[in-house]
């Protein structure tokens, strides 16, 4: 099992190329597989009278700035993922060679844009399902069904209350799209980063089928950058990554073989706990072993029989004392 961890940088770069680069470096150092920014052009997302229009405008950066960020991600071997909100941002994402983009939940019913995504060169689409109805999600996925799809559960509540995460919905989504072999689940929590649930919730989501996790990262909570309410600082994010990597290890690689593909450690445990066939009393050579002559006990002998049924009616070649292990060399 492999869990992809996406450092959600969103709007935390605040339109500053230097800040964006610092976030990329922090994400790479913490062990994230990918970074994700919102590639915003105010005019393709909102009207000038919208309350956050000026904020969106402040996030705009030049094509050269985004090219430099892509090059930095390549240097640190970390994937660059972009939220795109229209033709302009999608065009730049394609120009940059971006393979994975995110469809923000704001566009779950934006049919025209979904059709453009379907025809684009991107390979994977992260579909944000926060606040979306099931039929809206189904319609969106059907339009982009030729792409690899990561269906993301979770929404931003600045921060999101624990009880509103509704992780049980992931099983409903999994069942609803079980016929789509190209759809996998992702989880994006936005809980208070200082609360233990900021690690336990995504860990639980992995157990519910999430193979991609999105977690907000900030340069420092005290800086109160955009989206800081649910963002971990670099040290916290590193702990989060380490926990998820340990979950990957614990998940293991069980198989359908008779021994489930046991590890060497478990095989040794099996040897240590197995009971072996030993005598209940002193037995003389030539005796035919019956049900009252032997029993299963733990013993230091690793050569003794473990299946008691196999020794019944066998004849002893030599005499055995009480609690003696019964081996293949003792019977005929």
Regions found by a protein language model. Name each.
Residues 1-332:
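Catalytic cores and adjacent flexible loops of soluble metabolic enzymes
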